[in-house]
């Protein structure tokens, strides 16, 4: 009985064990299902490093990527654009320069750093030092990628020179415009990888670096790129060199081609569509062209001849343009005096009535009568020789007054010349009150036009009257003065508010017979006339007059008085 009960109990226990195992398995499955429902695939559950490393490295497709933050592919540097800053040896750099020359890549961007370019420029020089401008020039010529007008790479060159301790600033240049820069000895390893052969070896190796560059072809390609023109439009080598020395000037007229002056010491050539006009070679043709049109007053073609016209009177020109041009050709004025005023010959015509466009400026150059031919060759401001005997002679006075007078005695207010009549000798001649007496008596304001109008200085000590007339006091107060003669022979001043100027010494010296005969305000001529009249009348008081004037009895003494 007991064995049966034990077997029943064991069977029941095994059943319970199996049942519990099934229940536990179901419970685990239920928990896993609930866990999957609660935790989505992209939840914030911390993941291990292994799971993170197992993620694929390829980017997401456009369908699954976010439009807000698109993925950017990482930029990869190519081997050709990589700059060598101490990564290449000296031989590798020279080989790369040779490949660039063979492949025709000299105008492309070089794969070298700015510090390497500076080092190459300095060490290739014979003295091993260059100024900043020389470094610019060497880099621009050997690597045309860097334009001369571009300031960005030039700023980088300056920064490298200032911040890199491999470059040393030494003495000042000869012109005083900059300092020399050198490479510090022992700093070659910064530019050339594994270089331990010394400074002098590197410098000697770079002395023949010019063979890796085609300088002539590089300059031609550079000019084509900068100007955008072909080889046919490029200037010759000599013109290119001269253009660098002298500034280029372009003159553009409305109806004429461009005139380019590349040299200041050469006569410019006039470039036209068909030919080039050179004033030296085509002088005869230019003379013929201008002589054909010289009589045409409406043509304004070079050389521009200055003509004088009376704008107010309408008189003809005082200068013959044809004669003026022929005289200029004989003196070679076109090729020498006007070498910088040579302009292209055009067919531009002025208006038909171009005279009315003349301004008042032209009136300053017109003369109402041609100049006299008896002008002296000496200085215009020198005084004339003093001749007291002939100066006051009646014939000479008459001759002197004729060329200066513009009006007849009938139309003027002047009295007729003194005659030999006795009544006329008793009167003191009056000074001429003409318009000339009311001009400013300054002798330095205007230049005399002929020899007859030269200023005659007063025959007095220290030129007192001249100092009085030219005194700055009268010019400052601007007080007009009129000089009036009195019977006593003295000069009086009269303020005239209606007159705007002072008497003219220049005119009074020539028009008046007694302008220069006054001796300290005394009219010697009138005194002498009155004395001779009294002698001829046979007055009883002759002896008393001779006591006061003893020199009147001897004619030879008269000249002496006048000399005094």
From Swiss-Prot:
Cross-referenced CDD domains: FH_FOX
Disulphide bridges: none
Record field: compositional bias (Acidic residues): 224-241
One family name in Pfam for this protein: Forkhead
Effect of residue 163 to A: No recognition of DNA-binding site and no suppression of calmodulin mutants
Post-translational modification (record): Phosphorylated by CDK1.
DNA-binding region: 108-199
Any one Gene Ontology cellular component term annotated for this protein: chromatin
Matches recorded under SUPFAM superfamilies: Winged helix' DNA-binding domain (SSF46785)
Gene Ontology molecular function: DNA-binding transcription factor activity; DNA-binding transcription factor activity, RNA polymerase II-specific; mitochondrial transcription factor activity; RNA polymerase II cis-regulatory region sequence-specific DNA binding; sequence-specific DNA binding
Matches recorded under InterPro entries: Fork_head_dom, FOX_domain-containing, TF_fork_head_CS_1, TF_fork_head_CS_2, WH-like_DNA-bd_sf, WH_DNA-bd_sf
Biased composition range(s): Basic and acidic residues: 432-441
In-chain residues carrying the UniProt-annotated modification Phosphoserine: 496
Gene3D superfamilies for the chain: Winged helix-like DNA-binding domain superfamily/Winged helix DNA-binding domain
Renumbered residue ranges of the record's region Disordered: 33-80, 224-246, 401-448, 536-564
Primary localization class, coarse: cytoplasm
BP-aspect Gene Ontology terms: cellular response to oxidative stress; mitochondrion organization; positive regulation of transcription by RNA polymerase II; regulation of mitochondrial transcription; regulation of transcription by RNA polymerase II; spindle pole body organization
Note: Present with 358 molecules/cell in log phase SD medium.
Functional description taken from the UniProt entry: Transcription factor regulating the cell cycle specific transcription of a spindle pole body (SPB) calmodulin binding protein SPC110. Required for full induction of SPC110 transcription in late G1. Binds to DNA consensus sequence 5'-[AT]AA[TC]AAACAA[AT]-3'. Dosage dependent suppressor of calmodulin mutants which have specific defects in SPB assembly.
This protein's name: Forkhead transcription factor HCM1
Taxonomic lineage of the native organism: Eukaryota, Fungi, Dikarya, Ascomycota, Saccharomycotina
């Amino acid at each position: 009985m007991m064995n049966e009960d034990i077997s029943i109990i064991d069977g029941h226990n095994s059943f319970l064990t199996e049942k519990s195992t099934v229940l536990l398995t179901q419970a685990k499955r239920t928990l896993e299902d609930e866990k999957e429902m609660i935790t989505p695939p992209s939840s914030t559950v911390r993941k291990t490093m292994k799971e993170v490393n197992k993620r694929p490295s390829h980017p997401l497709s456009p369908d699954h990527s976010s439009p807000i933050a698109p993925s950017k592919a990482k930029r990869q540097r190519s081997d050709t654009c990589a700059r060598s800053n101490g990564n290449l040896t000296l031989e590798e750099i020279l080989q790369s320069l040779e490949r660039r020359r063979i492949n025709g890549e000299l105008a492309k961007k070089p794969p070298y750093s700015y510090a390497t370019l500076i080092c190459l420029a300095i060490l290739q020089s014979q003295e091993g030092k260059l100024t900043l401008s020389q470094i610019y020039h060497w880099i621009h010529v050997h690597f045309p990628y860097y334009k001369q007008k571009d300031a960005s790479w030039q700023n980088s060159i300056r920064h490298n020179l200032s911040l890199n301790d491999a470059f040393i600033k030494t003495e000042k240049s000869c012109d005083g415009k900059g300092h020399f820069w050198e490479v510090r000895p022992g700093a070659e390893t910064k530019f050339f990888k594994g270089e331990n052969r010394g400074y002098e070896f590197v410098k000697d190796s770079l002395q023949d670096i010019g063979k890796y560059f085609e300088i002539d072809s590089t300059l031609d390609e550079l000019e084509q790129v900068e100007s955008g023109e072909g080889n046919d439009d490029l200037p010759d080598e000599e013109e290119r060199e001269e253009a660098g020395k002298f500034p280029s000037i372009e003159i553009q007229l409305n109806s004429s081609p461009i005139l380019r002056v590349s040299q200041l010491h050469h006569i410019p050539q006039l470039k036209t569509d068909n030919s080039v006009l050179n004033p030296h070679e085509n002088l005869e043709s230019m003379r013929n062209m201008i002589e054909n049109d010289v009589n045409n007053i409406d043509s304004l073609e070079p050389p521009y001849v200055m003509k004088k016209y009376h704008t107010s009177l309408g008189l003809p020109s005082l200068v013959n343009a044809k004669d003026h041009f022929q005289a200029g050709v004989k003196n070679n004025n076109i090729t020498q005096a006007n070498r910088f005023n040579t302009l292209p010959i055009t067919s531009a015509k002025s208006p038909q009535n171009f005279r009315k466009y003349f301004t008042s400026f032209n009136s300053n150059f017109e003369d109402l009568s041609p100049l006299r031919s008896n002008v002296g060759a000496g200085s215009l401001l020198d005084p004339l020789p003093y001749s007291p005997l002939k100066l006051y002679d009646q014939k000479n006075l008459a001759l002197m007054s004729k060329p200066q007078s513009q009006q007849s005695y009938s139309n003027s207010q002047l009295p007729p010349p003194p005659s030999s009549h006795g009544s006329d000798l008793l009167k003191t001649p009056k000074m001429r009150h003409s318009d000339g007496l009311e001009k400013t008596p300054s002798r330095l304001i205007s230049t005399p036009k002929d020899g007859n109008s030269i200023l005659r200085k007063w025959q007095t000590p220290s030129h007192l009257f001249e100092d009085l007339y030219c005194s700055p006091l009268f010019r400052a107060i601007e007080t007009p003065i009129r000089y009036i003669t009195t019977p006593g022979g003295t000069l009086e001043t009269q303020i005239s508010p209606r007159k705007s100027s002072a008497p003219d010494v220049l005119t009074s010296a020539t028009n008046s017979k007694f302008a220069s005969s006054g001796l300290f305000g005394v009219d010697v001529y009138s005194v002498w006339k009155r004395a001779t009249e009294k002698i001829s009348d046979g007055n009883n008081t002759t002896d008393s007059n001779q006591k006061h004037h003893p020199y009147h009895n001897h004619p030879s003494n008269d000249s002496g008085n006048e000399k005094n």
